[in-house]
Amino acid sequence: MLRAPGCLLRTSVAPAAALAAALLSSLARCSLLEPRDPVASSLSPYFGTKTRYEDVNPVLLSGPEAPWRDPELLEGTCTPVQLVALIRHGTRYPTVKQIRKLRQLHGLLQARGSRDGGASSTGSRDLGAALADWPLWYADWMDGQLVEKGRQDMRQLALRLASLFPALFSRENYGRLRLITSSKHRCMDSSAAFLQGLWQHYHPGLPPPDVADMEFGPPTVNDKLMRFFDHCEKFLTEVEKNATALYHVEAFKTGPEMQNILKKVAATLQVPVNDLNADLIQVAFFTCSFDLAIKGVKSPWCDVFDIDDAKVLEYLNDLKQYWKRGYGYTINSRSSCTLFQDIFQHLDKAVEQKQRSQPISSPVILQFGHAETLLPLLSLMGYFKDKEPLTAYNYKKQMHRKFRSGLIVPYASNLIFVLYHCENAKTPKEQFRVQMLLNEKVLPLAYSQETVSFYEDLKNHYKDILQSCQTSEECELARANSTSDEL
């Protein structure tokens, strides 16, 4: 990967008087980030849901389009006959809410600079002054939209999957692809970029046409599947709109770990600690991640934090995901039953068609959603569950927790079900097997740690969800005259 000379700035060795000028000029010089940048890579594992996909799969840093085959993938007499993938959108801009918080923080730094001229007690320029001068290039119109890096995420994922499963992604099967997407533009644009990646696979060297001009046509929008949480009244009332549902998130913000960071950042930026809060600290940390993910530059915002700070801020993010999308409340995962059942309906149909020696009508189903789509589903299936809940008070005990959102659902994260037909099976049960991949790596079964399952056994394990979990009932609010167990 190319790197501009002097791209990596070390504020500790740069002449203090020239620090601000150096930081400003670096933006123009650093268009790509060295994969092993020591400062950026030291914080990268802790960005939570704002994590780059390649930081979860470091092999992609050197060859993002080269297929990587997990040695646990089945081969030989077992042939993949269907692939069902749930894919999070690619890298995106911050939301308008995050942009406005960053603008607020930037304004605090500029106001401080206008009072004291940006000089420290030694008369030199400090980090706060340099950040005040750092270009704030985020604008409200960006509001969570997919960036070019996000389109690249999708094109490259398409190329890798097509190379990994050539029979399923054959040119003959192109017209039988099924694409479903959330109505959010970042998901629709991700699906379009994925299709362009497939075009590149089929027609190397030729520029892809617009998706509307492809023989496949645009994907189907289905928010009841991809944004099931928006259609679950119980979730909306008891979690989304409940001021106390994220108690542990708010308690951690005022706890000792976050308060220590608050004081440290206030001292570093030379602003009154009362002018800062946990939300502003978090948006500063995320700005480091956005600059890295979107532009590939090492932002001076990264210099505000060290690894210990990053671990605390990651936990704050994980607390929110845990209580709002994971194991915190049962309805978080149960609201995804319809999506889980839909996946198995596709697999059932493929099994039935194969048993009848019919062609598989939908060999590849691609569904584009959000981190909020994937996390509840993985929780429903029993993945990444810790022995104790994540709370505001057990940060140190959870240092080695399983539930780390950045490792589970980075940008472009994907959960893939692969159905195999095995020719030399001794019994009908052994004919069909399933493997799951998370972020292109084989995901051991949550209940056995095996890397492959007979399809019938997998269905039996999840029988309760497949047969008894009815979203209409799960999401129905208790009637007003019924007994409530709320405190």
From Swiss-Prot:
The encoding gene: MINPP1
PTM annotation: N-glycosylated.
InterPro entries reported for this sequence: His_Pase_clade-2, His_PPase_superfam, Histidine_acid_Pase_euk
Bilayer-spanning residue ranges: none
Single Gene Ontology MF annotation: inositol pentakisphosphate phosphatase activity
UniProt-reported outcome of changing A284D: In PCH16; uncertain significance
Task of the protein: Multiple inositol polyphosphate phosphatase that hydrolyzes 1D-myo-inositol 1,3,4,5,6-pentakisphosphate (InsP5[2OH]) and 1D-myo-inositol hexakisphosphate (InsP6) to a range of less phosphorylated inositol phosphates. This regulates the availability of these various small molecule second messengers and metal chelators which control many aspects of cell physiology. Has a weak in vitro activity towards 1D-myo-inositol 1,4,5-trisphosphate which is unlikely to be physiologically relevant.
Residue interval(s) of motif Prevents secretion from ER: 484-487
Top EC category: hydrolase
UniProt source species: Homo sapiens
Broad class of the protein's primary localization: endoplasmic reticulum
Effect of S41L: In NMTC2; somatic mutation
SUPFAM superfamilies named among the record's database cross-references: Phosphoglycerate mutase-like (SSF53254)
Active site: H89
Tissue: Widely expressed with highest levels in kidney, liver, cerebellum and placenta.
Location of the protein in the cell: Endoplasmic reticulum lumen; Secreted; Cell membrane
GO cellular component, one term: endoplasmic reticulum lumen
Chain positions carrying an annotated carbohydrate: N242, N481
UniProt disease annotation: Thyroid cancer, non-medullary, 2: A form of non-medullary thyroid cancer (NMTC), a cancer characterized by tumors originating from the thyroid follicular cells. NMTCs represent approximately 95% of all cases of thyroid cancer and are classified into papillary, follicular, Hurthle cell, and anaplastic neoplasms. Pontocerebellar hypoplasia 16: A form of pontocerebellar hypoplasia, a disorder characterized by structural defects of the pons and cerebellum, evident upon brain imaging. PCH16 is an autosomal recessive, severe form characterized by hypotonia and severe global developmental delay apparent from early infancy. Other features may include stereotypic movements, spasticity, and progressive microcephaly.
Protein name, per record: Multiple inositol polyphosphate phosphatase 1
